[in-house]
Amino acid sequence: MTRIVVTGAAGFIGSNIIQGLNARGLNDIIAIDDLTQGDKFRNLAHLKISDYVDASVFYDLFANGAYGQIEAVFHEGACSDTMESNGKYMMDNNYATSVNLFQACQKRGARLLYASSAATYGGSDTFREDPAFERPLNVYGYSKLLFDQRMRRECGNDFRRSVAGKTGQVVGFRYFNVYGPHEQHKGRMASVAFHQFHQFQAEGKVKLFADYGGYAAGAQMRDFIFIDDVVAVNLWFFDHPGVSGIFNLGTGRAQPFNDVASSVVNALRGLSGQTALGLEALTEAGLIEYIPFPDALRGKYQSYTQADLSALRATGCDHPFADVQTGVSNYVQWLAQQDS
């Protein structure tokens, strides 16, 4: 039987990966997390796992063989708060823990598929997996970049040592702006779609940043990716153990925040039997409102991201990605069902 470890198992991406594994009939899953934030258990309650282990004790036990033969580790556990300023906390959680896990995987012969981040690019305007374009704007992005750099050294810059079987499969996914079910515990770090859904329910309108960084109001652009697509690509690499490397995981399509807001509002209007409106009509009706760009984010904000998918596609992974209109509409319907 295939035994799999998922860290950050009660988190957003981790719980969705377990759901994807369960859909394949894979239930021998050891879930690793820290449930100090107890309400995260809801992300696990509907899933099939064989064990739960607290993150504080797992890594040493795993390295010493306590869990038998592990096929693969999906490493989603991290501090993902880009506004966290405690560098020691961030480096301990995102870098040192990841290094320890990599070393344990090497010792136990387990494959490692881990969460990196588009935050590694920071202020760059090119989003390709190349050190020339890696310019993190915060310690979160740096913590993710440092582990990517460590994997390049351990596996060879082109991961030839992994491909040759000397390290086993090692794959890093540079997640762009992920949204979808089971992110409710993330607070301020939950997706724009999540916050706008609840804002519209409470206030009857959604708010976007006004013009900033050379972009018109609401026209700042991000590569928004639906969680189902993130899971599908993770599982594609799980199915292809001979493929290693660091890969962007976005849609390859930048869309403005206006698209997200319009999709949220129109999806909610549709659920109440109202017709969809264009952006101009939504703003004229006061359903979308623009607010001044906050000083606290100046110099720390990515106004544009778009994943270069050349490396991902070169592996043979041809998974199609949902656009904002499709993904957000599906997500809003799911959120509405949870509220009903």
From Swiss-Prot:
This is ADP-L-glycero-D-manno-heptose-6-epimerase. It is an enzyme of class 5 (isomerase). It comes from the Bacteria. Catalyzes the interconversion between ADP-D-glycero-beta-D-manno-heptose and ADP-L-glycero-beta-D-manno-heptose via an epimerization at carbon 6 of the heptose. The keyword Transferase does not apply. SUPFAM superfamilies: NAD(P)-binding Rossmann-fold domains (SSF51735). One of its GO terms (molecular function) is ADP-glyceromanno-heptose 6-epimerase activity. The lineage of its organism: Bacteria, Pseudomonadati, Pseudomonadota, Betaproteobacteria, Burkholderiales. Its cofactor is NADP(+). Belongs to the NAD(P)-dependent epimerase/dehydratase family. HldD subfamily.
